[in-house]
Amino acid sequence: MQYLTILGSTGSIGRSTLDIVRRHPDRFAVTALTANQGVAQMMSDCLEFHPSYAVMADEASAIALKEALAGHKLKTEVLTGTDALCQVAAHSSVDIVMAAIVGAAGLLPAMAAIKKGKTVLLANKEALVMSGRLFMDAAHHYSARILPVDSEHNAIFQCLPAEAQSALGNCDLSAAGVDKILLTGSGGPFRYTSLSQLSSVTPEQAVAHPNWSMGRKISVDSATMMNKGLEFIEAKWLFNATEEQIQVIIHPQSVIHSMVQYRDGSVLAQMGQPDMRTPIAHALGFPERVASGVSPLDFSRVGELSFLPVDFERYPCLKLAIEACWAGQGATTALNAANEIAVDAFLSGKIGFTQIHTVVLDVLSELKQANINDLESILAIDAEARLMAHQKITRLAV
């Protein structure tokens, strides 16, 4: 039996993870569930999975959950705050931690799990975007195992030889015969929208992804392709890739989730339905394969698979992310922080869709880069970039 902490259990990845757990009660049990404010969903999950701990990041939500559970004969202890998130991520009874908290808030609990040598199923992009080198070095130092859950990185992982899989963060792609990682992206809902119309895109249009079911923030990131930019940065750290070893390509159908091109001309691709239960099941069961509930591809119905080069005029946020990737961890931390604030402002109707790029660009242009050698430095840059982004949004909204 493998015992799990699910960080972000009420979100899209968390729901899919619990679906896999539900299908394999003989293999997986839940020690802890965490969420921000989703009291009703958390209560339902506590009644079904009987976790030892339920953590609500929001204190008022924790109080509400405790009151809601009071009438039930559960031994679930309700906790709140960042320290509690780190506590359940590092708990001695936990074998696997699903790191699925969206945003910078997921960094500290993911690092807490790493420092206790856990198997970390990494769905939180920001852990690597903000602290890639520190995070991978810590995983090596504490003998923690990282398994990528993002569909693209999980696909790349599956297409790599065993020696590269076992040395994430330090693998030598060239020695493994790899020429290039091909990171695929659908291009989002505005792939064919005229550039002149992008400034008038609404939040409702931006969150309507053509292929994937995702949360609102990640859906907007997919529309700007900032999501692919963050994945580009992740790929650099996970697979120890050089600038010449990663390429982004548009693949509208989202059937091929990414590819690895080898020196001999071979290209290995991982294919499947656009359903996150597939990479989650792969990571949970690794190195074995477990049922995910996802129906296999019917190749008689797949039809055309097409590929397009990236148009950086259409996706300037992706260009910013790639540039930040090679500028250093200070730049990627600032990029991520400014983007989180800008996307939230867009979803709240404070700025337009194309102004997300404007805010992020302005923050990156003005923020003084500092040496990054510890988490405190990263969090300081994160805070400064968020403040600057708020200030720029205030000026844009006037």
UniProtKB/Swiss-Prot annotation:
- Pfam families from the UniProt entry: DXP_redisom_C (PF08436), DXP_reductoisom (PF02670), DXPR_C (PF13288)
Q: Which InterPro entries match?
A: DXP_reductoisomerase, DXP_reductoisomerase_C, DXP_reductoisomerase_N, DXPR_C, DXPR_C_sf, NAD(P)-bd_dom_sf
Q: Which residues bind 1-deoxy-D-xylulose 5-phosphate?
A: K125, S151, E152, S186, H209, S222, N227, K228, E231
Q: Name one GO molecular function term.
A: NADPH binding
What protein family is recorded?
A: Belongs to the DXR family.
Disulfide bonds, paired cysteine numbers: none
Co-factor requirement: Mg(2+); Mn(2+)
HAMAP family, per this entry?
DXP_reductoisom
Which residues of this UniProt protein bind Mn(2+)? Answer: D150, E152, E231
Name one process (GO BP) from the record. isopentenyl diphosphate biosynthetic process, methylerythritol 4-phosphate pathway involved in terpenoid biosynthetic process
Q: Which organism is it from?
A: Tolumonas auensis (strain DSM 9187 / NBRC 110442 / TA 4)
Q: Which domain of life is it from?
A: Bacteria
Protein's name according to its UniProt entry: 1-deoxy-D-xylulose 5-phosphate reductoisomerase
The entry's NADPH-binding residues are: T10, G11, S12, I13, N124, E126, G215
Catalytic function, reaction form: 2-C-methyl-D-erythritol 4-phosphate + NADP(+) = 1-deoxy-D-xylulose 5-phosphate + NADPH + H(+)
Part of which pathway? Isoprenoid biosynthesis; isopentenyl diphosphate biosynthesis via DXP pathway; isopentenyl diphosphate from 1-deoxy-D-xylulose 5-phosphate: step 1/6
Query: Which keywords does this Swiss-Prot/TrEMBL entry list?
Result: Isoprene biosynthesis, Manganese, Metal-binding, NADP, Oxidoreductase
* Enzyme Commission number(s) from the entry: 1.1.1.267
Q: Which PANTHER family match?
A: 1-DEOXY-D-XYLULOSE 5-PHOSPHATE REDUCTOISOMERASE, 1-DEOXY-D-XYLULOSE 5-PHOSPHATE REDUCTOISOMERASE, CHLOROPLASTIC
Q: Which gene encodes it?
A: dxr
What this chain does, per the entry, is described as:
Catalyzes the NADPH-dependent rearrangement and reduction of 1-deoxy-D-xylulose-5-phosphate (DXP) to 2-C-methyl-D-erythritol 4-phosphate (MEP).
